[in-house]
Structures are given as structure tokens and as C-alpha cells.
Curated annotation (Swiss-Prot):
Annotated organism of origin: Escherichia coli (strain K12)
Taxonomic lineage of the native organism: Bacteria, Pseudomonadati, Pseudomonadota, Gammaproteobacteria, Enterobacterales
Residue ranges of every copy of the HRDC domain listed in the record: 529-609
The Helicase ATP-binding domain, residue ranges: 34-202
Name of the protein in its database record: ATP-dependent DNA helicase RecQ
Gene3D superfamilies in the record: HRDC domain, P-loop containing nucleotide triphosphate hydrolases, Winged helix-like DNA-binding domain superfamily/Winged helix DNA-binding domain
Amino acid sequence: MAQAEVLNLESGAKQVLQETFGYQQFRPGQEEIIDTVLSGRDCLVVMPTGGGKSLCYQIPALLLNGLTVVVSPLISLMKDQVDQLQANGVAAACLNSTQTREQQLEVMTGCRTGQIRLLYIAPERLMLDNFLEHLAHWNPVLLAVDEAHCISQWGHDFRPEYAALGQLRQRFPTLPFMALTATADDTTRQDIVRLLGLNDPLIQISSFDRPNIRYMLMEKFKPLDQLMRYVQEQRGKSGIIYCNSRAKVEDTAARLQSKGISAAAYHAGLENNVRADVQEKFQRDDLQIVVATVAFGMGINKPNVRFVVHFDIPRNIESYYQETGRAGRDGLPAEAMLFYDPADMAWLRRCLEEKPQGQLQDIERHKLNAMGAFAEAQTCRRLVLLNYFGEGRQEPCGNCDICLDPPKQYDGSTDAQIALSTIGRVNQRFGMGYVVEVIRGANNQRIRDYGHDKLKVYGMGRDKSHEHWVSVIRQLIHLGLVTQNIAQHSALQLTEAARPVLRGESSLQLAVPRIVALKPKAMQKSFGGNYDRKLFAKLRKLRKSIADESNVPPYVVFNDATLIEMAEQMPITASEMLSVNGVGMRKLERFGKPFMALIRAHVDGDDEE
């Protein structure tokens, strides 16, 4: 393309931005990407949700003379984009299975005659032989592959139909390709470039940081009640609640509705018209909350979602990041709340182990472990996210639960040096479990076979628990001093940032591992204050006695959450007891008296213990 022509197109980009899309200035990175595409060079764009990825191909589509084809995985995503473009006066259309044959022919005629500038299409439809023949005659000027991480088995949402897109480079060797994603680590990025056959692409990686989103975690205790209270505290704000099964989606939505909250279920098992109705009502603010499986949201461009809840832990950080990214797209404060129970992680791990052995299972295991490390982090959660994506930062954000309510710190320089030195001494070839065994001086054949029992660092940390050293190494990963090489069975490897700590040139504050105190502290925090642990123990003992007499499990009497609240509020009258979550009239009548008597005796200090 001639230089003068490129310059003319580049100046036109600002005009299209202002006149067609109504924005006065480009966001960081957008202009360079657009200029690169207009010059005919391939691009890989990694930009957070709400960061303006779509404009990177929509503006060139309006400046280049011809058809731009956009590969998109979901009908809802296509429809949303096309509706927005048409509202801006752009000749855009999509081809999908919900259209009649007449509608599809009309779209194809528009592509052939040049009336349509942007065509959205699913990968499986695009790759049909007869469609590729049509496309060749239409002389496309740009191919944009949205959600490009779907092409990579290293990605968090691999889709086999995306893998076939690699054949397009042979069919269209000179056509500029653009791949776009919000979530791709370095391995996934390399995979996208290789599998799509991108030629010397510009790789534009924007910051993954969404500073307006507050990342929070609540340990599950009585999850539905915790969720109800959380939603009620939102006071009518718009939100999405993600669950990992259709049944839980239905149950949770019904529970919210029973509390008078405007909520609806959304999952792939519902009829198309029901899903479309829910999506439309949510988009129009006629519905406060959508309770959904992960099928919901990829096509959502609702700017005023104020909170996203993960009622179950996702299988990987990429999914978590993408789904939480649907909050606060207007840049105003928003919150991402993760409900966490280590048992959920154990269940996901069991499910994973039932899958066929192989590289794909290894990838999924690595990603699941990273998600678990995020949930159990004792350092700034935003740092965990950003360092996972390779965006090295060491300054805590001040806007997550860890920063707002920090765990106790200690001078971890010596522990860090032991861990970092051990990683280096075993040649950065081994995973966390093995490194911890060396640190603690484990006496096993594998360590002896490698001669690692002869290392100076062997056994230097035997005075501390396995959990302690796992916590230390996880924190070093979160702080960007250590990485896990997914391609080498999650081997621990040192970064440049580790050098000054290893040399003793800088000290390092680490969080005291909350191995024992974590659960009680999380529960105490969830229920809004301190509770009397001695009284709690007595209440549990009484509950066990009553449950045994009644031949029911203890939780049928009162669950632990209710007992903690009793130990916090110390109710000694019927009205006070009824104010405790989990105590209704029937349970008050049946079990109330002995519990109130025990609490009264404890308060008066004249109980037996």
C-alpha cells in the first residue's frame, strides 16, 4: 500500500472514531493497532474486557475498501455486536443458524455486492468448503478472529472448531489477519500466532489491570445465606452470579426470587427464546440479576454491571478474569466476589484426574492449581492476576480483600532465600511438591537418585511445615519472583526479580501462613465481628448431644454458621434468638431453651466449664 494512502487512512481513523462511534480520543494501544492493520500487517491484540478491542477491527473495516470477516464463537455475541454497529449506522450483518434461508441469502447477496462491510460468522460455518469459495469471490480485506484463545489447547476455552481456522492462511496468503482476546498467557499467545499462521504480527498487549474492580473473597460457610445477604447489600445494583451447574443456577435464582429480588436463570438448557428474553431484560435494566452458567456473558456489553459473583470457583484464572471483567465496564467502581471452599477445589481436582492422561490434562491441572493459589493467596489478589498474565508488578493495589484486611506480615527474606536457592540448585526443573520435599529434607528415593540430598539447602526448612513452604512459594509466584513453566510440568523457575533477594540485597515481607487460623478468621469476617470461641465449642457440644438424642445429624439442629452468630451475639431471650440467622419459630420452640440456658450460664460465668 502506498505511503500517502496509508497516511490518509490513518487520519481517517480518528474521524471514524469521532463521527461513527462518538469517542473523542483513542484508548492506549488502539491507534497503533489500527494503523498496523491499515498498513496490511497481521496483529495479535490482547486487551482486557471493556478495553475497546472491537474498535481495532471495526474502524479499519470502515476505511478499507471491501468486506471484513469477523469470526465469533457465540450467536449472542454476534447479535450484540451487529445491533450496536447498525445503531451506529454501520452496514454489518451476521450469518448463523437462527436465520431463515431467505435471511441468509440476503446477507450473502449483501456481501457479494459490497453493501455489507462487516460480516460476523461462527468458525464452523466459515470453514465449510462452499462458503470459502463464496468468500474468495468476495475479495475480503481483513479477517478478524475474536476470542482467539479458543484456538489453543493451552487456552482456557479450547474449541475444536477454532482449530480448523489455521487452514485459512493457505487459502488467503496475503489477507491481513487480526487475532483478538482478553485473556492469553504467553504460551497461549505463541500458540495463537503459530496456529493462525500470523506473519510477523504486531503483538499488542495492553495492561490486564482493571483498577476499578475490587477483588474480594468470602469463604463458604452457609453459602446461600451469605449470598442472599451479599445481594441484599447491593441494594438493587445490577449483577451476574455464576454457578457451575444448571441445577445450582435454577436453585439460586429461585431462592433470590423468593426474597423478592429481581433475578432470572440463564443456561444452555433453556429454550432460545427464554434465554433471549432474559438477556434483553438484563440489558435493559428490567432485570437486576442474572444467575448463570459460564455460557452467559460473552455477548454482553452492559456497562453498568456493578458486581460479579462466582458462587463456585472457576477452573482457571483466564475464565475468572474474563467473567469478572463483565463488571464495571463503564469505569465506575465494581466488585468481583468469589465464594470459596477448599472442598470445591478438591472436587474439581478429582474430576480432572478422571479425564484421560496426557498433555491436555497437564495444562488443565496447571491452570486449576493457579486458580487455587489465587483463592488461597495471602498477598494482593490483583498482583496474583497480573503476574499470572506476565505483567510484573510488586506494588499492592489497595483495592482487594487482602489489601483492605491484610494478613500478618513477617520478614520472609530468609525463607525466600531458602526457597529461591532450592529452586536454583535443582536446576529449575522441578515442581512445587518436589522443591518443598528438598527444603524439608524428605527421605525418599527420588531425591537420593538426583543427589539432591547432598545439596546445602537440603533440609534447611525442616523446622516448618509442608503447608508453610507451599505458602511461601505461592507468595513468591504471586510477587513475580518465581514462575511455573506450564510446558515443563509446572517446573518452578526464577525471574530476574529474584536476584536481589537471593543476594541479600533486598528484604522481603511475606504473609504469615494462616494454616490453622484461616477458616475461623474467614468465618468471623464473613459474619461481621469476633465471636467467643469457648462458647462456640460449648454450643457445638450441646448440639451434638441434642442431635444424638433426636437421631439427626448435628446440622439439622443448627449449622455452624448459626452457632457462630450465637457465640457472637449471645442471645438469651426468645426475640434475640429469633434475630439469629438459622433460628426460626419451629427451631426456637424445639431447641431454643437449652441453648439460651447455656449462653446465659456462660455470660454469668457460672457454667461448669
